[in-house]
Amino acid sequence: MKNIRNFCIIAHIDHGKSTLADRLLDFTGAVTEREKQEQLLDSMDLERERGITIKSHAIQMDYVHEGEEFVLNLIDTPGHVDFSYEVSRSIAACEGALLVVDAAQSIQAQTISNLYLALENDLEIIPVLNKVDLPSANPEEVTDDIVDLLGCDPSEVIPASAKTGLGIKEILDAIINRVPAPSGKVDAPLRALIFDSVYNPFRGVETYFRVINGSIKKGEKIKFVATGKTYDADEVGTLRLKQFPRKEIKTGDVGYLITGIKDAREVKVGDTITSAVNPTTEAVAGFEDVKPMVFAGIYPVDTEDYEDLRSSMEKLQLNDASLVFLPESSAALGFGFRCGFLGMLHLEIIQERLEREFDMTVITTVPNVSYHAYTNKNPDDVILVNNPSDLPEPSSLNRVEEPFIKATIITKADYVGNVMGLCIEKRGEITNQTYLTTERVELTFDMPLAEIVFDFYDRLKTVSRGYASFDYTPIGLRESKLVKVDVLLNANIVDALSALLHVDNAYDIGKKMCEKLKELIPRQQFDIPIQAAIGAKIIARETVKALRKDVTAKCYGGDISRKRKLLEKQKKGKKRMRQVGNVEIPQEAFMAVLKLND
């Protein structure tokens, strides 16, 4: 046990976690020449293309240091704020962390939020300055930033380049010398932390775990604490590039477990595995059910594909237990699902995976967050509003509460004004402003989650020329004045375009929606009024003008009554058409509502 080291790599997006992991694997010989490829641990095509890590991965390496053999378990973590719970569980499975900072970009918001997670779990932090070979790198200044943040000695910061392989040996030596060995009781009852699960179509769910006390043997009966279900450990082993079956996994080590579970929802990340015969009394602390933050409707473009969409969603859920969905129907779009996601990136990824892996073309409605509504009749009973149509009638509504977050934004000092302007426009309240260095400022805001869902991230990058980085944590619900804005086409409500908005923004957004739809809806043979309404009150209107034939073209001479007769006849026809006419909404219209400011 004293020769095991468990560590993870934490960094902001794009600071080079996955490439550094590749180099560590090369250096320790965990990968043969034939298996090498860029971002080896990112197994999804999507992860490779976008250059992000979506799932956590784990891999074991052997390394000989001063004649002794050591086993290193690397747990790779996602960098994106949507997956912060997954990161926190991976961190809890380690004793040390490599804090990777890009020498050109310095410390960013997620570097700090993941660092706090690591410090809360008492991890030994090894700072690594990555990308020092870049022409734009600024190693001295960034080293000072790291020293300020961690309070460490400048000599402890390891300069490295994952691209060229510089500093890799120093990193491995630092892991062995500075990261403590696992401390656990070998003879205590089994207690292991689940930090990830992967669905394998042939063998069911593979559970990745780290043993804290005791050991887990092949064939023994085990129990998951949160769900209370018992299983047989059909196979246990360690994770090399391929799985490596073993008879038992001992205290302090990381491994995988196959029990033949077919439903990923039974394996909860952060849960505790214990023996069914001799269970542990205390579970590993910090487990929580992952709650979706953002909701959107997903509908098949062709209503007949509903069943295919259902089976695709179920297959995705096997691999991604944080996805939740319920059937719902809409008058405009037919049958579909109301889905819950961890954040906007998660929503995009699911949509892309549906298109890629299952060839489904889907329509996504306006994403919104989950509100709590209270009626006058029962002011204490919470009504969960995940869909604008669930909001009670305005007359019976007592109050609505919406989720707030604490947003941390790190930006260059030159852009503070722009960033503040954007956050205040998004109903944020500034709570703190700290200068990290003379150049870089950390701003914290309390703001509604709903404002971030739309286009906040893109606009933040725009106003700061790409320099600002952003991170958030939920801080609970607050009361807020919200109204439901409906969009009417030809006097019919289009339920898929309804949105819950704050009173102050309702008029502006309603007007913008109407203008945007006017551009996108093709002209028909009759006038189409597009209206935005709060309840029965119309707040904005645009009209898509009719296409009309010039009926008077065949009249020579000037008899006005003849012309008038033809025009009146045309007018009657158009009126009749409008009563029976049906307006098709193009797919772009639904997406365009999300990008109102372009």
Swiss-Prot record:
UniProt KW keywords: Cell inner membrane, Cell membrane, GTP-binding, Hydrolase, Membrane, Nucleotide-binding, Protein biosynthesis
Gene3D superfamilies (UniProt xref): 3.30.70.240, Elongation factor 4, C-terminal domain, Elongation Factor G (Translational Gtpase), domain 3, P-loop containing nucleotide triphosphate hydrolases, Translation factors
Record-level GO BP terms: positive regulation of translation
Superkingdom of the source species: Bacteria
Residues annotated as domain tr-type G: 2-183
MF terms (GO), sorted A to Z: GTP binding; GTPase activity; ribosome binding; translation elongation factor activity
Reactions this protein catalyses: GTP + H2O = GDP + phosphate + H(+)
GO cellular component terms listed in the entry, alphabetical order: plasma membrane
Xref: Pfam families: EFG_C (PF00679), GTP_EFTU (PF00009), GTP_EFTU_D2 (PF03144), LepA_C (PF06421)
UniProt xrefs under InterPro entries: EF-4, EFG_III/V, EFG_V-like, EFTu-like_2, LepA_C_sf, LepA_CTD, LepA_IV, P-loop_NTPase
The protein, known as: Elongation factor 4
Organism: Christiangramia forsetii (strain DSM 17595 / CGMCC 1.15422 / KT0803)
Underlying gene: lepA
